[in-house]
Amino acid sequence: MTNPVRWLFSTNHKDIGTLYFIFGAIAGVMGTCFSVLIRMELARPGDQILGGNHQLYNVLITAHAFLMIFFMVMPAMIGGSGNWSVPILIGAPDMAFPRLNNISFWLLPPSLLLLLSSALVEVGSGTGWTVYPPLSGITSHSGGAVDSAISSLHLSGVSSILGSINFITTISNMRGPGMTMHRSPLFVWSVPVTAFPLLLSLPVLAGAITMLLTDRNFNTTFSDPAGGGDPILYQHLFRFFGHPEVYIPILPGSGIISHIVSTFSGKPVFGYLGMVYAMISIGVLGFLVWAHHMFTVGLDVDTRAYFTAATMIIAVPTGIKIFSWIATMWGGSIQYKTPMLFAVGFIFLFTIGGLTGIVLANSGLDIALHDTYYVVAHFHYVLSMGAVFALFAGFHYWVGKIFGRTYPETLGQIHFWITFFGVNLTLFPMHFLGLSGMPRRIPDYPDAYAGWNALSSFGSYISVVGIRRFFVVVTITSSSGNNITRANIPWAVEQNSTTLEWLVQSPPAFHTFGELPAIKETKSYVK
């Protein structure tokens, strides 16, 4: 990091991927700090650390959600992993639009600053990440905080749209000779399947929050029934974006998991084509289920029946992926190195999150469970243990390629077990709280809920210890790990991997390929 000009103006996909990773790590640390503050407040009944300031509690909730989704998971998963891996995996010299790639990243820091500054303006933005009116309207949040948060969303949305255009163009036009789509690794497939929903859904969000902005500042009434508007319109528009948005971090994660499970089982992925079509199905179906977040707003019974059925159908391609991973492991000689531990943890916990999703898909049950901690537990099992475990797995899998050094295996495994124990202890009790009717976004609760909340808060402290261990692993690897030569890549040579990233030096040269590789072999594993 000695030359700031190189990092500011770089158009190299590896440099920009590294910037995305660093940015994601910083945002992730901030988001984790907010989540620990939330859990400290909820550790016991009554007012604990926020002095009874319920608005501040909701500002923390809002900032935690935005930081984790828009500034940690998405930049690290799509910007970081995508930028580093996709050009190498398809045999391309770089991304299709390198300068667009640069601005895609540099739109994010100002966006983050706008979000953080919104918390410091007057009483902050305590709307939740959904920013639903009338709570986000000018009468309920009169200062500039919500406007600042909306501007932040606009900027990060532009960043994602530009990045998506870049990835789609790169993968469709810049594959090396012989690298057909059906020879591409599954991570390469997962990126355009992620980019298309982003490209289609973000403009809808932009429209919705622009309406909100004009309602707040220019006296329009899109969300105000007094002027002929409807707050439910905003909910439909937001959720049309918001539901594909929650699949967006998971799909590249599932691509990473496919690589890892294949490598450490010593077998090609079971049902490659099925995996591809399952990913595409999830990407398409994600657009058809948004109103399952809105079962309590007074939808027609036939509308609720449709959204219940459509939501349950998403479980089918998801199940295909889960069972294909299990079938890949079946009969393989499995090595439980750190990436594989995270991959198996991902499969197990993502499955639990999916099962609670099936419960919540029932519109009748959701009337009781909506906005309780059951929903919080569900989406954290999918995101906190799906997307984040996939990121950890991918980091340990490719870190040798990125740094040219091996990570300390024992410390990596300790990191896994502490984190696994911590997140489960945090989130599993939330199912019981939700079934008992404890509502979300409220910083105080009756004494009856005290036991499970105390356990949950204790689990969050353990998770922080695990995440600190991760940064220890990163520091040791980047500064003093064993150098990797082509002969001692930890697992690529053992498993005779034929994805392209293992065939270039570690770390890859500034310009990865002297000449474009010609792909003649379609098998992903040779015994």
Swiss-Prot record:
The chain crosses the membrane at residues 18-38, 59-79, 103-123, 149-169, 193-213, 246-266, 269-289, 312-332, 340-360, 375-395, 414-434, 447-467. Heme a3 binds at H378. InterPro entries: Cyt_c_oxase-like_su1_dom (IPR023616), Cyt_c_oxase-like_su1_sf (IPR036927), Cyt_C_Oxase_1 (IPR000883), Cyt_c_oxase_su1_dom (IPR033944). O2 binds at Y247. It is a multi-pass membrane protein. One of its GO terms (biological process) is aerobic respiration. Gene3D superfamilies: Cytochrome c oxidase-like, subunit I domain. Component of the cytochrome c oxidase (complex IV, CIV), a multisubunit enzyme composed of a catalytic core of 3 subunits and several supernumerary subunits. The complex exists as a monomer or a dimer and forms supercomplexes (SCs) in the inner mitochondrial membrane with ubiquinol-cytochrome c oxidoreductase (cytochrome b-c1 complex, complex III, CIII). Component of the cytochrome c oxidase, the last enzyme in the mitochondrial electron transport chain which drives oxidative phosphorylation. The respiratory chain contains 3 multisubunit complexes succinate dehydrogenase (complex II, CII), ubiquinol-cytochrome c oxidoreductase (cytochrome b-c1 complex, complex III, CIII) and cytochrome c oxidase (complex IV, CIV), that cooperate to transfer electrons derived from NADH and succinate to molecular oxygen, creating an electrochemical gradient over the inner membrane that drives transmembrane transport and the ATP synthase. GO terms for molecular function: cytochrome-c oxidase activity; heme binding; metal ion binding. It is found in: Mitochondrion inner membrane. The keyword Signal does not apply. Cu cation binds at H243, H292, H293. The gene is COX1. This is Cytochrome c oxidase subunit 1. GO terms for cellular component: mitochondrial inner membrane; respiratory chain complex IV. Belongs to the heme-copper respiratory oxidase family. Keywords: Calcium, Copper, Electron transport, Heme, Iron, Magnesium, Membrane, Metal-binding, Mitochondrion, Mitochondrion inner membrane, Respiratory chain, Translocase, Transmembrane, Transmembrane helix, Transport.
